[in-house]
């Protein structure tokens, strides 16, 4: 009896350590098939690295739903007509399509979208860090190096902006930690 309960409790713990996700589907504002992604309903985290990477059943955030026909990441619910015109130019550009077809990490592409749209780097620098997590172990040496060097440059730029604008001291320290971690 005791052994049976012990086995059930071990399996119960194992099952409870899994991330609970559900597929989501949203309309692709740039046309084509619906964008598909996953939403996290709950997960177990056993720790956090200096770079903010969580360890446990689900180790990184899910990217926004991705349009399967063009690689656009539907990063918000509604877009104005002028935003869609601007996004269409970038998403269908050779630069973006090349990134998508060469399987650049979704968070790297998302950071590039934000940059193209003129968003402040202080609002999306962390996407570059998340992109490194996709390649943070062998055999991805060259890809990890590429995305890490990109993240380092963005973090340096972010520090410069934060210093000159006297933004949040906590965020300023956080960016320094991220830079040291990479």
Residue ranges and their predicted role:
Residues 82, 98-105, 146-149:
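Alpha-helix boundary/N-cap detector
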